[in-house]
Amino acid sequence: YDGTNCKPGVCWEPKPGY
């Protein structure tokens, strides 16, 4: 994803290697 990644119930900023 671009910007922030979101899963059911949690969101976080994309980290290198993910």
Swiss-Prot record:
Enzyme kind, highest EC tier: oxidoreductase
GO molecular-function term, one example from the UniProt record: alcohol dehydrogenase (NAD+) activity
Database matches in InterPro entries: Meth_DH_bsu, Meth_DH_bsu_sf
Highest rank taxon of the organism: Bacteria
Gene Ontology cellular-component annotations: periplasmic space
Reaction catalysed by this enzyme: 2 Fe(III)-[cytochrome cL] + a primary alcohol = 2 Fe(II)-[cytochrome cL] + an aldehyde + 2 H(+)
EC number(s) stated in the UniProt entry for this protein: 1.1.2.7
Reported function: Catalyzes the oxidation of primary alcohols including methanol.
Name of the protein in question: Methanol dehydrogenase [cytochrome c] subunit 2
